[in-house]
């Protein structure tokens, strides 16, 4: 689906390449959802959405149930969503999305990586103009479904008319205004779509070319950032490698 599809296709496995870390990060999302809306998925739309994403990432049912149970414990940490942004090497914008129970630790970890690679960590919001903040929903394709009709129904929620279809997985991914997250999810569920997994993403509005050598350095920086458990996703405005095998 244009720039969003190009960017997400290249970044997908880099974000969720290590299964253990994937489950840790999803566990934090479960904790936040339970804290906000309770442990019952039928009464907590956000939790339903996170569980659908967990299933799509092959997170075992026992892990999901344990994460929900742990989230109700008195000793469960309170996670906070924080973003950190700045310029990495070669003038590439780097946007780091985190869930943390210790912002002092997290900002120190992130800053250390920026410094190591000759980057510069900026203030919150300093690079917001380089990325479009979107909500996204992935759901199973239904037999005989009319995507044009569905998109038309969702126009009032600022859903984009371009969408991403994965024939191998049998899923559709749509993008919309983050403020309309709950309304979009409700509409999709009322339409009978199954396993509606929702999330938020940042899509670069202009991709920058880099040389193979520059890409290697930037990939190392991204990998180093993603080693931290607090880091959920790292976004950049680096143009994906053509003909690469990231997915």
From Swiss-Prot:
Pfam families: TACO1_YebC_N, Transcrip_reg. InterPro entries: Integrase-like_N, TACO1_YebC-like_2nd/3rd_dom, TACO1_YebC_N, Transcrip_reg_TACO1-like, Transcrip_reg_TACO1-like_dom3, YebC-like. GO terms for molecular function: DNA binding. The keyword Transcription regulation applies. Keywords: Cytoplasm, DNA-binding, Transcription, Transcription regulation. The keyword Ligase does not apply. GO terms for cellular component: cytosol. Its main location: cytoplasm. It comes from the Bacteria. NCBIfam families: PRK12378.1 (NF009044), YebC/PmpR family DNA-binding transcriptional regulator (TIGR01033). PANTHER family: TRANSCRIPTIONAL REGULATORY PROTEIN YEBC-RELATED, TRANSLATIONAL ACTIVATOR OF CYTOCHROME C OXIDASE 1. HAMAP family: Transcrip_reg_TACO1. This is Probable transcriptional regulatory protein BT_0627.
